[in-house]
């Protein structure tokens, strides 16, 4: 159960928020006009989104200007509010009757330099150095990237008529990471590991069935691959070799017999591309297999009492469902927080936690 939601005994449970526009807290009479508010915290390069609907039935509201920066804090009355970050107004609508103003704001403004196509070659850089070059080019704050990714050596890679957003996404996919832009900085991190973008462990949460009013579990048929094979060619020796990474149980743990995503022990996916060296081949195999595991199952649940402190990449255990669901460890892929006439709820979409998956590596010269 989510026992760290500390609400006063006997108190009226009331959602609360503050919305700051241009460093000024939204006036109370305007806040009272908000019909609905929702904020989606996403993983990956999909920007977090803030949706607001205002009552303009008397025609007295001014429509906000695109590019305006909003800052949201969300939670419950008489409790510390959670900082949901900064959002840039992207879309404004007016509809009726009765008249309403709709506002969509996003955590990153991709309308500027991120949309420009760039051609550049990177020779003998680290992954972190490339990310910092892109960050500087787009006039962002210093990026946040854990040391294990920052130090990855890249002998050569080309950005050929690609936007920086597309190129960053390609880099993330190649090295088993995710990338996003939040609060003016690029975050480049390992997905599904329950860690912050800087590599710090996020505390585990436990959700029991009574915390939610509906849920859905889905197992996707990915042939339950339990390994990935990649080949590389050494130009100096003119030899081609392959590396196979096969899943093995984490140390000290037994494989879950009910798991749908562990693999059968015989299904190995072979990558068609020939890589330039062993390290690149290993990283490619690791990245692809982690993605297969991450996509193998999805579990969603709507919490009856909203939890603004639950965000993407937080690790979660669940209890009170089927064994195959409870035995799987999860990480939050996205969190949708909503305030409307029904109250404050949070919908979570969970993906498998992959940090405790270990591999057996075997190398074969072809």
Regions found by a protein language model. Name each.
Residues 1-112:
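Assembly/oligomerization scaffold segments
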Residues 33, 37-65, 211-366:
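An acidic/polar, Gly/Ser/Thr-rich interaction patch typically located in mid-to-C-terminal regions
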Residues 114-118:
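Short acidic, glycine/proline-rich loop/turn micro-motifs
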Residues 86-95, 120, 157, 193-195, ...:
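Short, compositionally biased
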Residues 74-76, 190, 320:
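Conserved "cap/hinge" positions at secondary-structure junctions
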Residues 51-53, 105, 119-143, 158-182, ...:
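Amphipathic, non-transmembrane alpha-helical segments in extracytoplasmic/periplasmic proteins
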Residues 48, 99, 184-185, 342:
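Beta-strand-connecting loop/turn residues
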Residues 2-3, 7, 100, 106-109, ...:
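Short beta-strand-centered interaction patches in the first periplasmic/extracellular domains
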């Amino acid at each position: 159960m989510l026992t760290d939601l500390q609400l006063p005994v006997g108190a009226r449970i009331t959602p609360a928020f503050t919305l700051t526009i241009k460093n000024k807290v939204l006036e109370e009479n305007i806040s009272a006009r908000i019909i609905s508010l929702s904020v989606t915290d996403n993983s990956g390069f999909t920007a977090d989104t803030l949706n607001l609907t205002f009552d303009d039935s008397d025609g007295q509201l001014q429509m906000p200007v695109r590019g305006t920066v909003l800052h949201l804090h969300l939670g419950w009355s008489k409790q510390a509010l959670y900082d949901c970050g900064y959002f840039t107004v992207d879309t404004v609508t007016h509809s009726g009757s009765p008249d309403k103003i709709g506002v969509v704001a996003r955590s990153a403004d991709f309308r500027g330099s991120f949309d420009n196509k760039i051609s550049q070659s990177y020779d003998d850089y680290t992954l972190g150095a490339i990310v910092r070059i892109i960050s500087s080019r787009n006039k962002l704050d210093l990026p946040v990237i854990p040391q294990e990714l920052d130090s990855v050596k890249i002998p050569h890679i080309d950005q050929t008529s690609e936007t920086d957003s597309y190129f960053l996404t390609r880099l993330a996919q190649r090295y088993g990471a995710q990338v996003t832009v939040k609060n003016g900085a690029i975050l480049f991190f390992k997905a599904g590991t329950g860690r912050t973008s800087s590599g710090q462990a996020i505390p585990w949460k436990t959700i029991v069935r009574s915390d939610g009013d509906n849920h859905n579990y889905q197992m996707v048929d990915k042939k339950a691959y339990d390994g990935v094979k990649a080949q590389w060619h050494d130009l100096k020796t003119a030899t081609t070799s392959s590396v196979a990474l096969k899943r093995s149980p984490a140390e000290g743990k037994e494989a879950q017999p009910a798991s749908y995503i562990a693999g059968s022990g015989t299904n190995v996916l072979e990558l068609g591309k020939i890589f330039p060296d062993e390290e690149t081949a290993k990283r490619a195999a690791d990245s692809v297999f982690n993605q297969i595991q991450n996509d193998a199952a999805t579990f969603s649940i709507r919490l009856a009492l909203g939890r603004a402190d639950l965000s993407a990449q937080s690790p979660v255990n669940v209890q009170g469902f089927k064994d195959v669901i409870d035995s799987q460890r999860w990480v939050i892929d996205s969190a949708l927080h909503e305030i409307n006439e029904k109250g404050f709820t949070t919908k979570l979409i969970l993906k498998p936690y992959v940090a405790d998956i270990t591999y057996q590596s075997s190398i074969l010269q072809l």
